[in-house]
């Protein structure tokens, strides 16, 4: 630690950023425009000084590519600090030096209670030494790894503070670009402190950035596909990954290889555990693949879930999103919350009774009746596999909506990735320190079986990678991340274009049967999954009507199959003159007169629509028409025309009936 500079009055507040006009000066000049600056600024020293005279160095907090971070105590004041030492001889890439200096300038310019503060900077020809705020509780990563699952109140506490800090950065024109659990620290009071601005940069709304950096597990679709981006949208995506991890205790995107991870992120495909959480709507909004539809930091800060239980919102700004997504997401979240509370109350009153088959079918039908945009944000049924955004225009029949046997479903998913998480990502990601960790027990291991933690069965169905990584291969949150990579390293075009998505398996016969039965028209009433006695009167059922077994045999056309399930063929025949609307209004009785005229089940206006009365005599008679004449009775006469002409209409109807006879 020898050779650092001593404080000297009048020192210029620069770090040797180069001659006028150089790229370094441009970086310094840009960051100097940040407002507001700290009241007293950051001391920068370039004169020889021995830091050991001022600070008592203690244990090492973390090691990085260019040096290490140590805890230290200032001898004069007793203040505990973190000292980050960077060796210049290990910096081979000029771009890395630019990032280090940019980090110092940006962090020195930001003043927020949830962002790590820089107190002093020392530099000589060999080293750059940064004296910064010390966060005694360590990384949020370790905090979650020890507890596996946080309460919603604690999750909201952490996430509000993270959003507050990110909103402050965006408000001052700074995008972090490397938000992850390892870069979020906790102080003595378990308050958030965001660190590591090594990949941060200034942004402007009318300009695009093209540096593809960050951690792959938190990278947005724009980053992994090498598309230009403005900046804040990549932080919004990372916030979605963070919130998912805080809520569920695992990572949303857990591809076990390069190609799979790229596909998952590009399609926004992630597992959504079935344990209820009111934050799932906000998570989906932040993990929208289209950056124009993705929640902005203002949308997140004003979301009801983030501010639930607090007197004020995270920020006093207005949401800038023009789409209907915020309102829709709020309505859907409220619906889920109210439905869940009502279900819990009913379960307690009924002695925790299980839902009946009819209730499950009703819930599935409700989910299918939702609009396309609402289905994009929420799923009402836990047993329904949602459609991918590319297939929203073509609705799937209910017959192929399969129940998930592993008590999980996927959000924005078109397939399910089977198998255990395999090897870590290849070296192209430069993320050895982010993919595996050995210091924490796997939930599936016997040693991890402790009360209050996930059972082995639950662990087997959740992503095996989770957030467990190797301690020795991961840098400290105080340290700059060397994970910058170009688009050519992150993606081979054939990987995305050539990747295939598993198609859903064909439905089984039982599922097809249930689908067909549920498609009957509204005139047929169902009670407890069985048709009413009046509808299924044995006298009404023709002995010649095909059975389910006969319809499933070869040679029966598909058209006949659909007709037979929905109604008797005599009712829905193309040649029939019976009004389907009038038929639906019938109240079939057990005992009816032996003979009634056809007007009891026919609307007069149906006959008035027929122009060619003579042609009716040559048309084939509807099947089973005589049987229905004998059985149907006492129905009201439907007449939608002007009531003043009722006599004339009635006479015309009688004339038509006589021609039919």
Swiss-Prot record:
Q: What is known of its domains?
A: The GILK motif mediates interaction with PPP1CB.
According to the record, the protein's activity is controlled as follows:
Activated by phosphorylation on Thr-211. Activated by phosphorylation at Ser-600 AKT1 during glucose starvation; the relevance of such activation in normal cells is however unsure.
Tissue specificity: Expressed at high levels in heart and brain, and at lower levels in skeletal muscle, kidney, ovary, placenta, lung and liver. Highly up-regulated in colorectal cancer cell lines.
The gene coding this protein: NUAK1
So what does this thing catalyse?
L-seryl-[protein] + ATP = O-phospho-L-seryl-[protein] + ADP + H(+); L-threonyl-[protein] + ATP = O-phospho-L-threonyl-[protein] + ADP + H(+)
In the record, the note on similarity to other proteins reads: Belongs to the protein kinase superfamily. CAMK Ser/Thr protein kinase family. SNF1 subfamily.
Q: Which residues form the Protein kinase domain?
A: 55-306
According to UniProt, the name of this protein is NUAK family SNF1-like kinase 1
The Phosphoserine modification is found at 22, 455, 600
Q: Which cofactor does it need?
A: Mg(2+)
Query: Where is the stretch described as Disordered?
Result: 1-24, 345-421, 442-570
The active site of this protein is located at 178 (proton acceptor)
- Please explain the role this protein plays, according to its UniProt record: Serine/threonine-protein kinase involved in various processes such as cell adhesion, regulation of cell ploidy and senescence, cell proliferation and tumor progression. Phosphorylates ATM, CASP6, LATS1, PPP1R12A and p53/TP53. Acts as a regulator of cellular senescence and cellular ploidy by mediating phosphorylation of 'Ser-464' of LATS1, thereby controlling its stability. Controls cell adhesion by regulating activity of the myosin protein phosphatase 1 (PP1) complex.
Q: What is its main location?
A: nucleus
Q: Which residues carry this modification: Phosphothreonine?
A: 211
Q: Where is the composition biased (Basic residues)?
A: 393-404, 518-529
Species name? Homo sapiens
Upregulation details from the record are:
Transcriptionally regulated by members of the MAF family.
> What post-translational modification information does the record give?
Ubiquitinated with 'Lys-29'- and 'Lys-33'-linked polyubiquitins which appear to impede LKB1-mediated phosphorylation. Deubiquitinated by USP9X.
**Cell compartment(s), UniProt:** Nucleus; Cytoplasm
Residue positions of the PTM N-acetylmethionine?
1
* Known EC number: 2.7.11.1
Source domain of life is Eukaryota
Alphabetically sorted, this entry's keywords are:
Acetylation, ATP-binding, Cell adhesion, Cytoplasm, DNA damage, Kinase, Magnesium, Metal-binding, Nucleotide-binding, Nucleus, Phosphoprotein, Serine/threonine-protein kinase, Transferase, Ubl conjugation
């Amino acid at each position: 630690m020898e050779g650092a500079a001593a404080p000297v009055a009048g020192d210029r507040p620069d770090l040797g950023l180069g001659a006028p006009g150089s790229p370094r000066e441009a970086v310094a000049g840009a960051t100097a425009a940040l407002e507001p600056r700290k009241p007293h600024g950051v001391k920068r020293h370039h004169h020889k000084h021995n830091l050991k005279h001022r600070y008592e160095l203690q244990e090492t907090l973390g090691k990085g590519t260019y040096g290490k971070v140590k805890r230290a105590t200032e001898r004069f004041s007793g203040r505990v600090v973190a000292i980050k030492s960077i060796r210049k001889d290990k910096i081979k890439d000029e771009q890395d030096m630019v990032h280090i200096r940019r980090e110092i300038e940006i962090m020195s310019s930001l003043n927020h209670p949830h962002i790590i503060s820089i107190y002093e900077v020392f530099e000589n020809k060999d080293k750059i030494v940064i004296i910064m705020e010390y966060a005694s509780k360590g990384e949020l990563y370790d905090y979650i790894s020890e507890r596996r699952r946080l309460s919603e109140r604690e999750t909201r506490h952490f996430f509000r503070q993270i959003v507050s800090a990110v909103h402050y950065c965006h408000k001052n024109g700074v995008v972090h670009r490397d938000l992850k659990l390892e870069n979020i620290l906790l102080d003595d009071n378990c308050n958030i402190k965001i660190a590591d601005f090594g990949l941060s940069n200034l942004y402007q709304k009318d300009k695009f950035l093209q540096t593809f950096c960050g951690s792959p597990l938190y990278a947005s679709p724009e980053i992994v596909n090498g598309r230009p981006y403005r900046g804040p949208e990549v932080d919004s995506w990372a916030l979605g990954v963070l919130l998912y991890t805080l809520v569920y205790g695992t990572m949303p995107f857990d591809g076990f290889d390069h190609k799979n991870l790229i596909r998952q992120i590009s399609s926004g495909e992630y597992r959504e555990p079935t344990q209820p959480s009111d934050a799932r709507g906000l998570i989906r909004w932040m993990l929208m693949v289209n950056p124009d539809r993705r929640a902005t930091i203002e949308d997140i800060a004003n979301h009801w879930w983030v501010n639930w239980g607090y007197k004020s919102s995270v920020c006093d700004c207005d949401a800038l999103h023009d789409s209907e997504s915020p309102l829709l997401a709020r309505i859907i979240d409220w619906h889920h919350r109210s439905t869940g509370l009502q279900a819990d109350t009913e379960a307690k009153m009924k002695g925790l009774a299980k839902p009946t088959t009819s209730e499950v079918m009703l819930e599935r039908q409700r989910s299918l009746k939702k609009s396309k945009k609402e289905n994009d944000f929420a799923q009402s049924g836990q047993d329904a596999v949602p459609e991918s955004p590319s297939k929203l225009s073509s609705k799937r029949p209910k017959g192929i909506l399969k129940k998930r046997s592993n008590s999980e479903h996927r959000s924005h998913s078109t397939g399910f990735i089977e198998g255990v998480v395999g090897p870590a990502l290849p070296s192209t990601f430069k993320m050895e320190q982010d993919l595996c960790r050995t210091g924490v027990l796997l939930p599936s291991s016997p040693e991890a079986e402790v009360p209050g933690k996930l059972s082995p069965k639950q662990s087997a169905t959740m992503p095996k990678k989770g957030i467990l990584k190797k301690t020795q291969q991961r840098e400290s949150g105080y340290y700059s991340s060397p994970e910058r990579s170009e688009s050519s390293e992150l993606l081979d075009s054939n990987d995305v274009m050539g990747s295939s998505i598993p198609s859903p398996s064909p439905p089984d016969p039982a599922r097809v049967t249930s689908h067909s039965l549920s498609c009957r028209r509204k005139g047929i009433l169902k009670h407890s999954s069985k048709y009413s006695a009046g509808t299924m009167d044995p006298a009404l059922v023709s002995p010649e009507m095909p059975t389910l077994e006969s319809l499933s045999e070869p040679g029966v056309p598909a058209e006949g199959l659909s007709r037979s399930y929905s109604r008797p063929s005599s009712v829905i025949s193309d040649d029939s003159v019976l009004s389907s609307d009038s038929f639906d209004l019938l109240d079939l009785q057990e005992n009816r007169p032996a003979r009634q005229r056809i007007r009891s089940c026919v609307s007069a206006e149906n006959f008035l629509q027929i122009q060619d009365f003579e042609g009716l005599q040559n048309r084939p008679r509807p099947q089973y028409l005589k049987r229905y004449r004998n059985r149907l009775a006492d129905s009201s006469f439907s007449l939608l025309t002007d009531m003043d002409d009722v006599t004339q209409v009635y006479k015309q109807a009688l004339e038509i009936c006589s021609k039919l006879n």
